[in-house]
Amino acid sequence: AAVLLAGGQGTRLGFDGPKGMYDIGLPSGSTLFCLISQRLVKLSQLAKASHGQDGVSMDVKIPLYIMTSPMNHDETKSYFESNQYFGLPAEDVIFFSQGVLPCLSTKGKILLEKPYQCSMAPDGNGGIYPAMEKSGVLADMVQRGILHIHTFAIDNSLVKPADPNFIGYCIQTKADCGNKVLWKSDPHEKVGVIAEKDGKPCVVEYSELSKDMAERLVLVEQEQLAFGAANICNHYYHINFLQNQVIPN
């Protein structure tokens, strides 16, 4: 299954609407939602052609779960409906909303939307885990017999949804989870990096790296940045890992 993190608005892009509806300037006018959906359609076709036997084609389904936010849920859903789900089967496109948290000022004060009402904002990509459980998405995956999950963010126009190579590698190595990274183009590139803290892998935001840490070099096969593996929000999970390790904790 593919899980798309699409709770954000296009505000920083100068666009008033869900980020996935943003036109990135292609000659086709395709939006991010359109690109990702069309790639899944093509992947389904390729998988179907590859695994048919004796002239009988195999039914291939790759469900797309889209995590929205309360701010863009209805608009996102309507956009897919009005575009006939970009060729995907409607029953295989599932929308669910992440939670919200109170907005705080830099001094830790709760901000108000209006008198007696807290200003709220989506709870970030990490909100996917409680949202999957509360919305019934995890149960739906189990009911469908899904074992392998590819999760990625909407603002990656080059993403390969349900990436066969990435998922296949994780299956081959019997990984519970995986994280695809890109190497930083510059020591001070504004991107979080994969690191190790107290013996456990973690993501460190660029704002938390000192100048010395950002520029530190280590010798592997050749000199390279010690903190150069940029996190691009591109993850693999086995369903058992989510059920038994992530959700309970």
Task: Describe the predicted segments one by one.
Residues 1-4, 11-249:
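Domain-scale recognition of functional cores that engage charged ligands
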